[in-house]
Design a protein with these regions (language model features):
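Short amphipathic alpha-helical patches
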Residues: 42, 99-103, 145, 172, ...
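Charged phosphate-binding loop/patch that engages nucleotide di/tri-phosphates or the phosphate backbone
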Residues: 153-182
């Protein structure tokens, strides 16, 4: 009988892997511009070049038994510090959007249980001030973003990590009538 190679991981069959249930949040200010954050630690996860160019809208997992709308408001507060009382949900995606992780992350991220994420998107109108944003969360939450800004929706496709681009294309198309025009 041969010895098992402890350094080899079992082959992952992508077709057997599920998508992680998740929400995405589009926050619009009074000028219909979109809140985006630059990924903290992007060099190790989303940005192998380390040039810090990957930005995204808030997103995160849906907890067991949690409604997607509640998850959207929770994730918004965890990642941006924006309180649910400062926003109003004005739209919800008509479908769930999916993306697959790149091969080097599949089987590693989220305990190796998911091939990617399946996201329900919400558009929120922000009625607060920029000073209401706090991207340094209270423990035990990790910092998601190291910078933030308001952007025109047509900037986003050039700023998002490539493996999420198709989701952003779909979301931006679905909600195009809500965004500021240049």
């Amino acid at each position: 009988m041969g010895k098992k190679d402890k350094n080899k991981s079992p082959k992952i069959d992508i077709d057997d892997m599920a998508y992680r249930p998740c929400v995405g949040v589009i926050v619009l200010n009074a000028q219909d511009m979109v809140w985006i954050g630059r990924r903290a630690g992007a060099k190790t996860v989303n940005d192998p070049t380390g040039d810090g160019r990957w930005w995204q809208m808030p997103q995160g997992g849906i907890d067991r038994g949690e409604a997607p709308r509640a998850a959207a408001l929770r994730e918004l507060e965890e990642e941006t510090g924006i309180d649910a009382g400062k926003v109003e949900i004005i739209a919800e995606s008509s479908t769930w959007y999916r993306y697959d992780l790149p091969g080097d992350l599949m089987g590693k991220k989220w305990g190796g249980r998911y091939r990617g994420q399946e996201q329900k998107w919400f558009v929120l109108r922000f009625a607060g001030a920029d000073s209401d944003v706090n991207i340094t969360p209270e423990p035990p939450h990790e910092i998601e973003f190291d910078a933030w800004r308001w952007a025109h929706a047509d900037e986003l496709l050039d700023l998002i990590v490539p493996f999420k681009r198709q989701v952003y294309e779909g979301v931006l198309e679905e909600f195009a009538d809500l965004f500021a025009k240049r």
